[in-house]
Swiss-Prot record:
Entry-linked SMART domains: DUF167 (SM01152)
Name of the protein in its database record: UPF0235 protein Sbal_3028
Matching Pfam families: DUF167
InterPro entries, per the entry: DUF167, YggU-like_sf
Family: Belongs to the UPF0235 family.
């Protein structure tokens, strides 16, 4: 499976998370996953909450439209973004490569 997949208007992201980073950003590819750096530590679900907030802001959707499908407790996650309003250029480039 690729890092980014468009499925019935939703975006499926296979992510590798780097917690406790200096800033929030989509870094690029990490193997077959998209690497995302976030500032939150991986303690008591703070990283997941922060990741959901960051992705919601990035894709201009409510936090309730960000779903962690797999990897709740690990660095490797599969995320579903319901009907994203904006898709960042780094992700559209990856989608173009996999088409």
């Amino acid at each position: 499976m690729s890092a980014v997949t468009l499925q019935q208007g939703d975006l499926l992201l296979n992510l590798y998370i780097q917690p406790k980073a200096s800033r929030d950003q989509i870094v690029g590819l990490h193997g077959d996953e998209l690497k995302v750096a976030i500032t939150a530590p991986p303690i008591d679900g703070k990283a997941n909450a922060h990741l959901s907030k960051y992705l919601a802001k990035t894709f201009k959707v409510p936090k309730s439209d960000i779903h962690i499908m797999k990897g709740e407790l690990g660095r490797h996650k599969q995320i579903r973004v319901i009907d994203p309003k904006i898709i960042p250029s780094i992700i559209t480039e990856l989608m173009g490569q996999t088409s």
